[in-house]
Amino acid sequence: MSTIANDLIDFYYCGHSLSEYNGIIGDIGGGDAVGAVEIGNVLNLNPVELKSLKKRKSTAVTYDGYVEKQFSFFKNLCKGSDGFYTREEVSEIIRWLNQPNYEKFTPVYSDTTWPRVHYYATFNIQPITYMGNVIGFQLSMTTSAPFGYYDEVYLSGHGILVVDDTSEEQGFIYPVCSITASMNGHIVFKNSQKEEDVTIIANCKEGETITLNGEFGTIQTSMPHANLYNDFNYVFPKIWNHMDTSMGTNSFRNIFDVNLDGSLIEITYSPISKFGLI
């Protein structure tokens, strides 16, 4: 069981920060009167592998424990707190943190030079008690993948789009990719990294925007397209990052092009970070 170091001073989860709840990360030490008790659901997610490599999505929840990182937080006494959590405050924190799905978690460190990395995590919670009062919470965190993600990147271009992937993981990522047809016709979309992987959507209309999400295997259109699922060949665009063994150098440049001249290409993705939790 590993713990998070003292550099962590705050975090964001499900759109809220620990500081919003007047919390401060720390370690209170031992003593017979101090203990942790079970509360909420001890969540052990039943994950399935997604098409993006090494990433999981929960499909069911069972009640067992699995810990990747652990840390504790308490009330910030510098803000006039008596140090004890009321029953209502305990319930509010459980609702916030004890989620059955992997939600976005962003740590905040005292050293502002650390890069901002996001994870998708669930928490198991144990209130820490002293003389019958709740004084803090011990959190056990499980993430959806063995890596994190840097801030989301958005890129766009007409006809051609160059993506220099900054991921620290070799392999591929499924981006969210939108193509707006400049004219009626069949969209043929290629990546210079893997020219054999050709994405085709037939019978598109001028101004129609096709949005592809390979991670979840979805295709959407901005206009009525009666036979969309038959017109798509189900080859989702990928962003590649790998070692080119013939050249001995990193190969991270992806040049996307579409056959319909002037069509707008938009790509959104989050580069993979192996920075790790401090």
Residue ranges and their predicted role:
Residues 69-71, 119, 137-139, 175, ...:
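Hydrophobic residues positioned within well-ordered beta-strands of beta-sheet architectures
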Residues 149-278:
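Intrinsically disordered, low-complexity segments enriched in serine, threonine, and glycine
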Residues 65-110:
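Long, hydrophobic/aromatic-enriched structural stretches that serve as scaffold segments
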Residues 51-84, 133-147, 250:
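Oligomerization/assembly interface segments of phage tail-like spikes and tubes
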Residues 18-29, 115-123, 197-204:
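Short amphipathic beta-strand/extended segments with alternating polar/hydrophobic composition
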Residues 3-13, 103-107, 186-190, 219-221:
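Short polybasic amphipathic segments
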Residues 1-47:
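Polar/acidic, low-complexity leader/linker segments enriched in S/T/G and N/D
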Residues 99-147:
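Short beta-strand and beta-hairpin "edge-sheet" elements
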